[in-house]
Amino acid sequence: MSEPADLHAAVLEALVGEFGRYKRTAERALDQLRDEDFFVRLNDRQNSIYVIVKHMAGNMRSRWTDFLTSDGEKPDRHRDDEFIEQSVPREQILRMWEEGWQCTFAALSELREGDLLKTVTIRGEPMTAVSAITRQVAHYAHHVGQIILIANHIKGPDWKWLTIPPGQSETYSRRMQGK
């Protein structure tokens, strides 16, 4: 493999890895919730986890469908509707979540050497594909953080930590360095 191909593969692997890490982390938070918890709003200006998931799924479908060949803001996306609360079953929420991620990973798996430097557009704004992808990593990380914050708030003392629990950093570091 050539150096550019190696770099392309390494960058793409790192980006896909980050998307996967955020997906898994959010799912570990979602798994802790009761059905009704998906609709809790911390205040009247905050979104529920359901709305965040619906928004992320809509964004993923729009951004990743025909990623290299069409604007990332599809004409049939109604973004404002993503922020409307509805009562839907947990299974439907998780299906939206999974379909959004499937669209994301499918688009990323189709990228080939040289594609990261191609120009794509989002809302008419041109950028390199790698810029658009890193923008999405940041966007999804933001919303995954919101999901975790809300879930942690809901669960209170029953929250199961998704990362190193408070007071466990030194033990964790010693264990990892001993591997």
Can you say where each PLM-predicted feature lies in the sequence?
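Short, contiguous alpha-helical
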Residues: S2, V16-K23, E27, D35-D81, ...
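Small beta-barrel nucleic-acid-binding modules, principally OB-folds
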Residues: A9, R21-T25, A107
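Short, charged, low-complexity loops and linkers
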Residues: S2-V16, I84-Q86, Q92
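Short, solvent-exposed, charged loop/turn and helix-capping segments
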Residues: L33-E36, L111
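Acidic/histidine-rich alpha-helical segments that form the ligand environment
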Residues: I84-V120, M127-A141, Q146
